[in-house]
Amino acid sequence: MVIFKSPLPVGQHQSLEVIAPVGELALNVHLALAKQHEVKPPFIDVMSGKAWHAEEIRDRVDHLARVLAKQFGWQPNVGTPWDKVVAIYSYNTVDFIILSWAVHRLGGLCLLLHSTSSAGEIAAHLKRVQCAAIFTNEPLLATTRKARELLNGEPQKIFILDVANELLPEGHVNSDLTTVEQLAQKGAELEALEPLKWDAVNGRDQVAYLCPTSGTSGAQKLAKVTHGGLLANAVQTVAHELKTNQGKTEVGLNFLPCSHIYGMMLSHTMATRGDCMVLHPFFDLKRVLGSIARFRIERLYLVPSIISALTRNPFLLDMVDLSSVTSVVTGAAPFGSSLADGLHTLRPKWHLQPGWGLTEGGGASSLTPKDDFVPGSSGVLLPLTEVRLIGEDGKDAEGHEVRGEIYMKSPSVIAGYLEDANTQNPFTEDGWLRTGDIGMFKVSPKGVEHLWVVDRVKDMIKVKGMQVAPAELEAHLLLLPQIAEVAVIGVADKISGERPKAFIVQAKNAGPEEQLRETINQHVEATLSEPHWLGKRIEFVNDLPKTSSGKAMKSVLRAKA
């Protein structure tokens, strides 16, 4: 058995002991830092500009916990987490995070629902979990009600997480439903709750969130994300960057949905290490760029599709003052070397930090150090992360530059999926997580092992027995300036078994389709082997179906093909 490990340790001062719910631990970090020196607030709401300080958040968590206890008849030390569940179907708001921490204060858990989900998807998740209420926004209320109709009016209670007026549809009239702000005001008048009796051992494995998987290859599954997993991922990330950050805290950008593992992990990791998060309700290019200058944001957490848009429209980077930016972290989808080169050319002083992770891994599993960027790499394994690469023959891949499916172990991994007869256990009998991603290790010029994530097992295309990685072909196609976005899938072929097909979104002024089709085929055939050739299997589309984190939904494209 060949096991690849992180070269970085976790310091002795960085404890993985879960002595309280993860949100409480994060606030304690901020409060401790504030006693030593001036610190920035954990969260800034970009819409209002309001800074949320740790003391204020702590009080609001307590007030909401009090009122939830009264509303639902809950007590901190009575019942199990599964007796105290709420669903959150919302855009990003600071109260989204505070509400979840209030539920944790009562020993409960939260079912997270992507704001892009349909009524049917929401109903399917709600049907599997007994929720006391669903918290949503006014713009999402109609979909919420449709989902409840599918379940005969369950859950009975709906509460509103307020969003800025400018996010409301034109002519919208607010409902008369109780808001979280009103709940917090009521909670402030109620008696204090008894302390939560937290068991550090059992608390490590206690479920904090039910988080939907991306659903890129099929129906969403509900992953059980634990308090211990979230804390571990925060500690792993801090330890990974200890050398280059030297304990410095940063102001970071986040528009990634808090219902997605990437956004949720950031919310807890940044808070746990004392950073300040500038939180957006969702991605809006003009608003995002403006906030970087307004709040002097230092670190950008992005996804490759947005980086692609910026590199293809470089004037956007000159519209506002971006002098505060020092680093860009990217994940949720492959970050090809051509994209990395494009951004590095435009902003050579920015540290590019591609990473890799997945819902089942509990967030980030690898990250590029600021001082060891390698184009095309997904970075270095986080401390305490172990990886095996399993070949098609079921044997461990040995050495570097040998591909295999990534099996991993880490204290951050989920506790499995919510039980479903149709959901396969993602773990092997000896505890390795089968990620479904294909990767390999290469050594950087500095002599450090980097992980390269090549593609998904489910997405690999078999042409005459030869494997074609869609991500490799996609990265190659994106070298053409006429292509804005692309997704490649495999389609049946009588002679070859399968062949690649490309769905392409054209860039502006791309020219006639037939001419572009010819250019694409010449480009591919001149540089890639015959199994990669597209021929007539090129379809031009106005846009690609995507998940809330920006991944192309290839299951939708396969159904269309």
Swiss-Prot record:
Span list, region SBD1? 284-354
What keywords appear on the UniProt entry? ATP-binding, Ligase, Nucleotide-binding
Biotechnology: applications noted: FR901469 inhibits the activity of 1,3-beta-glucan synthase from Candida albicans and Aspergillus fumigatus. With minimal inhibitory concentrations (MICs) against Candida albicans and Aspergillus fumigatus of 0.63 ug/ml and 0.16 ug/ml, repectively, FR901469 displays greater inhibitory activity than other 1,3-beta-glucan synthase inhibitors such as, WF11899A, echinocandin B, aculeacin A, and papulacandin B.
Q: What is its EC number?
A: 6.2.1.-
Region (SBD2) location: 355-417
Pathway annotation from the record = Antifungal biosynthesis
GO molecular function per UniProt: ATP binding; CoA-ligase activity
> What is the main EC category here?
ligase
Pfam families hit by this protein? AMP-binding, AMP-binding_C
- What domain of life does the native source organism fall in? Eukaryota
Residues where ATP binds? 213-221, 354-359, 437, 456, 551
Q: What induces it?
A: Expression is positively regulated by the cluster-specific transcription factor frbF.
Q: Which family does it belong to?
A: Belongs to the ATP-dependent AMP-binding enzyme family.
| Free-text function comment from the UniProt entry | Acyl-CoA ligase; part of the gene cluster that mediates the biosynthesis of the antifungal antibiotic FR901469, an inhibitor of beta-1,3-glucansynthase, exerting antifungal activity against the pathogenes Candida albicans and Aspergillus fumigatus. FR901469 is a cyclic depsipeptide containing 12 amino acid residues and a fatty acid chain. The NRPS frbI contains 12 modules responsible for the formation of the depsipeptide backbone which is denoted as Acyl-Thr-Ala-Tyr-Val-4OHPro-Thr-Thr-3OHPro-threo3OHGln-Gly-Thr-Orn-OH (C71H116N14O23).
Question: Domain note for this entry?
Answer: Both substrate-binding domains (SBD1 and SBD2) are involved in the substrate recognition, and are sufficient to confer the substrate specificity.
Name this polypeptide is given: Acyl-CoA ligase frbB
Q: Which organism is it from?
A: Dothideomycetidae sp. (strain 11243) (Fungal sp. (strain No.11243))
